[in-house]
């Protein structure tokens, strides 16, 4: 059922340039809303319990299972694995099991840095951020592009501290203001149109290349497309999605658990399909 050219991969090209960028923007906004009613100590305690513990101690207790599947997909166990000491093999599986937990690892680091920054700037940046008008919001793509060029870890390309860090801070200091998202809501239709047009050209231009690594992932086109979609989503959701239903309330309660476990379930399903069926 598979062909040499995987056209369904276009979905990944559509999502990758903006999905995590948007998630860090929203994470910064959520940090602001939480800190309006809690102390820095409460914020750090909650973030450590919810972000750091699962992504560190949790790796040794549970997420090594994800590492097992990751290594099985890579055929590591077919390469004289029996010669590796069991303790060393376990540690390798632990490291391989990080998977999607990289997001909460980065988010915890940024949360700690945010608390330190708050002690220095005393909310002056937050007050200044409310003044950001539409041209400024559009031009923020320039520092975002600049940040995308720095603080990127080698080999493991998901740890992009530069772009994710600036987006987290922009979410906290700029986009957490109702006036700012109201401005985006006023131009949500043009933004959505621009996002769709850029999406078509982006997929057409880069299809077949590795969208997750340099030079594609931090190219001017990738950042422009990703930033435009982020603004369009924030403006569109403020205009049309600013409501709560039973379904969204349920998702809010379950989203963290779905985030933690969805990849393991998908990996397990893919493993058994690959090993015990003729699908592939």
Q: Where do the model's predicted regions map?
A:
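Alpha-helical transmembrane segments and their immediate juxtamembrane cytosolic regions
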Residues: 1-280
